[in-house]
């Protein structure tokens, strides 16, 4: 396309790819929350504001709303957010949906009690830094940050996630990326996933639970 940089063309292609994936009737990652997220229910505050980053069809954002949180769900796919809207309605909850580039969103300072990022590994290393810095910035002091992603070992399983190793998460990457948090813990393990067609089978994952 004349006048469009290679980087911009790649971004548009990524957007088109996800728009296409989300155009199917089924929820590609299922309608239930991510297992790691659901297992942290006991850590959630009673009330407050939550941000779900690159939330797609909002299975996680809707679940957070069901726990009594005021949820903002951001994603760049309008097709995904159409399905998110329908899922929220079917569960009897309201969430705020913003169709945006998660790397360019302002992440307002000290706004959210909970910030969640689950399997959003489409960012370049530079974009990832912007996104993670924003996630930390918008978290209130004492707020909870929950993250799950695939590790490089996931390339052996071939059951989902990116094929580019630089987009997969390592312990040292998370330790550096979230060093500004007051405290955090990281766990790596293999698990069997059953979260829609998009996350099915054995997987190599890494989790972070942190507080600002």
Indicate residue ranges for each PLM-predicted region.
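Conserved SAM/SAH-binding beta-strand->alpha-helix loop
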Residues: 77-79
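Conserved SAM-binding strand-loop segment of SAM-dependent methyltransferases
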Residues: 91-103
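Conserved class I S-adenosyl-L-methionine
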Residues: 3-45, 47-56, 153
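Short alpha-helix
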Residues: 166-186
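Conserved beta-strand signature within the Rossmann-like core of class I S-adenosyl-L-methionine
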Residues: 142-150
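A short acidic, Gly/Pro-enriched loop at the edge of an enzyme's catalytic core
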Residues: 103-114
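A short, conserved alpha-helix within the catalytic core of class I
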Residues: 122-135
């Amino acid at each position: 396309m004349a006048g469009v940089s290679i980087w911009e063309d790649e971004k548009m292609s990524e957007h088109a790819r996800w728009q296409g994936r989300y155009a199917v009737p089924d929820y590609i990652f299922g309608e239930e929350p991510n297992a790691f997220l659901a297992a942290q229910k006991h850590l959630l505050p009673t009330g407050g504001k939550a941000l779900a980053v690159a939330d797609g069809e909002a299975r996680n954002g809707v679940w957070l709303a069901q726990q009594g949180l005021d949820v903002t769900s951001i994603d760049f796919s309008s097709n995904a957010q159409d399905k998110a809207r329908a899922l929220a309605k079917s569960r009897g909850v309201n969430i705020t949906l913003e169709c945006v580039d998660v790397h360019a969103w302002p992440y307002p300072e000290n706004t959210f009690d909970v910030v969640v990022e689950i399997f959003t590994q489409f960012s370049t290393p530079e974009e990832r830094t912007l996104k993670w810095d924003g996630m930390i910035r918008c978290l209130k002091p004492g707020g909870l940050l929950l993250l799950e992603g695939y590790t490089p070992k996931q390339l052996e399983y071939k059951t989902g996630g990116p094929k580019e190793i630089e987009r997969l998460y390592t312990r040292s990457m998370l330790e550096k990326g979230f060093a500004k948090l007051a405290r955090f813990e990281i766990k790596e393990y293999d698990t069997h996933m059953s979260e829609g067609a998009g996350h099915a089978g054995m997987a190599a994952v890494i989790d972070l639970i942190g507080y600002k």
